[in-house]
Amino acid sequence: MSKPESCDENACKPFACAIQDCLIENGYNESKCTKAIDNLYKCCKQFYEENGPDAASVCCPKFNLLQLKLKQRSLGKIDAELIQSRK
């Protein structure tokens, strides 16, 4: 899990920036950015382990929401997918 170089070193900000970059590169198709999302959640998990559940980072979900997201991801595919509109 290497850090993207284009962002500041705020708590997990490089990983949040990597998600933004991935979404832009993939036409906002979240399902193509699973690895970037997982990397952010791993960073946020470490952030809370080091700073406690009451810590805050603008780049991380609140502690309880992060726990829910990690549980959901462990249960299977949960990324949003783009649905092609009919023309």
Swiss-Prot record:
Residues 9-51 form the CHCH domain. The keyword Ubl conjugation does not apply. It is found in: Mitochondrion intermembrane space. InterPro entries: CMC4, Cys_alpha_HP_mot_SF. Pfam families: CMC4. The twin Cx9C motifs are involved in the recognition by the mitochondrial disulfide relay system. The keyword Disulfide bond applies. GO terms for cellular component: mitochondrial intermembrane space. A motif (Cx9C motif 1) lies at residues 12-22. Disulfide bonds join 12-43, 22-33. PROSITE patterns: CHCH. Coiled coil: none annotated. This is Cx9C motif-containing protein 4, mitochondrial. A motif (Cx9C motif 2) lies at residues 33-43. Keywords: Disulfide bond, Mitochondrion, Repeat. Belongs to the CMC4 family.
